[in-house]
Amino acid sequence: MAVPKRRMSRSNTRHRRAQWKASTPNLVPVTVDGVTLRVPRHLVPAYRRGLLRPEI
């Protein structure tokens, strides 16, 4: 595990953390019960198997 050699200032720490940005999930179309929905790719199998119900 990486260990810092020197202490990082509060200013540098906050500037570094401020660069992180959340990205929107890539939505893909999936048809469930005759209704086409746009859902995140990793949830498509759950919708197809019926583990998640579409909220319309």
Swiss-Prot record:
The GO cellular component terms are:
large ribosomal subunit
Q: Where is this region: Disordered?
A: 1-22
What GO MF annotations does this protein's record show? structural constituent of ribosome
Superkingdom in the source lineage: Bacteria
UniProt keywords, alphabetically: Ribonucleoprotein, Ribosomal protein
Q: Which residues form a coiled coil?
A: none
Offer one Pfam family short name for this entry.
Answer: Ribosomal_L32p
**Biased composition annotated in UniProt, kind: Basic residues:** 1-19
Span-the-membrane segments of this chain are none
Might you name a Gene Ontology BP term for this protein? translation
| The family this protein is said to belong to | Belongs to the bacterial ribosomal protein bL32 family.
Protein name (record)? Large ribosomal subunit protein bL32B
Starting at the broadest rank, the lineage of the source organism is: Bacteria, Bacillati, Actinomycetota, Actinomycetes, Kitasatosporales
